[in-house]
Regions:
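Membrane-embedded alpha-helical bundles of polytopic integral membrane proteins
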Residues: 2-226
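Alpha-helical transmembrane segments that form the membrane-embedded catalytic/substrate-binding core
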Residues: 19, 162-163, 182-194, 232-235, ...
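Hydrophobic alpha-helical transmembrane segments of integral membrane proteins
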Residues: 68, 252, 269-270
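Re-entrant/interfacial helical elements at transmembrane boundaries that shape
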Residues: 166-168, 243-247, 269, 274
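Transmembrane alpha-helix interface/packing and boundary motifs in multi-pass membrane proteins
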Residues: 227-231, 253
Length: 279
């Protein structure tokens, strides 16, 4: 029985590695295409956000109610496509709220108010937070893609580091009631790995694009690496609570070994805004 379990764990690890490589390839292509068609980042983030919200609504159990599903997905799709447009963004927020309130009244006897609140609140959070990744390209044309890469990989490196370290030496459970596989050793390992790789990312960016001519604060990068590692865990555990509450293992199965789009971007929901405000 133990060998079977170990075999399944190895298989899951291989799936995670292969899927992770695919995601990295997609991000690399996204970065390259960004220089040809800058608006491509907004389109990609809109599709990612809409998919994540669709999975979220499905997990809560409201997918069959189109009056909740369609406005939520449409809102998630629209916001990244109208960045830096405060007026139209506010109109979109207002219309989404009106649709959700109207749907709540219409389905009052059929749907739990708690479920509606989860869908509405998390749709606002996920959409607004992931939209910060789209907004990063307006911050500084010279370094905007570094911010985007850092927002994505700071979350993923910490998660991957924690997973692999925890898989090999993890003994003490971090939050067994929320995420049984997460360990203290994994969290510490992810923290250290994230700091090291974020500093390496800054070094390579300076070396490749500027011939080491920029003045890089490695202390700042180390702090960013440490803080984002912690925020990554917070994001992961927060969305794990939702999955636990609705008795689902993953939000979806779009990415083998990782789950759905929401599973892959749950940490980015917290890390993205941090990178954006600390640009």
């Amino acid at each position: 029985m133990q060998s079977v379990t170990e075999g399944l764990e190895v298989s899951d690890m291989i799936k995670r590695i292969l899927s992770g490589c695919l995601v990295i390839g997609i991000v690399a292509a996204m970065i390259g295409f960004q220089f040809i068609f800058p608006y491509s980042l907004n389109i990609i983030m809109a599709l990612i956000t809409a998919t994540a919200v669709f999975e979220l609504v499905s997990a809560v159990g409201l997918r069959k109610y189109l009056t909740f599903l369609l406005p939520s997905v449409a809102f998630a799709l629209a916001i990244p496509l109208i960045p830096n447009q405060m007026y139209w963004s506010m109109v979109t927020y207002f219309l989404y709220t009106i649709f959700m309130l109207g749907s709540t009244i219409y389905h009052y006897k059929k749907v739990k108010f708690q479920d509606i609140c989860v869908v509405y609140g998390m749709t606002l959070l996920v959409t607004t937070a992931l939209n910060t990744v789209s907004l990063m390209r307006y911050l500084n044309p010279q370094h905007c893609m570094l911010y985007v890469v850092m927002a994505l990989f700071a979350a993923w490196i910490a998660d991957a580091g924690a997973y692999f370290v925890g898989s090999f030496i993890g003994k003490h459970k971090l939050c067994p009631n929320i995420s049984p596989k997460k360990t203290v050793e994994g969290a510490v390992g992810g923290f250290i790995i994230n700091i090291g790789l974020i500093m390496l990312m800054g070094y390579l960016y300076n070396l490749i694009f500027y011939g080491s001519q920029l003045s890089v604060s490695y202390l700042s990068l180390a702090i960013i690496g440490g803080v984002t590692a912690i925020l990554s865990i917070v994001g992961d555990l927060s969305f794990s609570i939702i999955k636990r509450s609705y008795d689902v293992k993953d939000f979806g199965n779009l990415i083998p070994g990782h789950g759905g789009m929401m599973d892959r971007f749950d940490s980015v929901v917290i890390v993205g805004p941090f990178i954006y405000v600390n640009k």
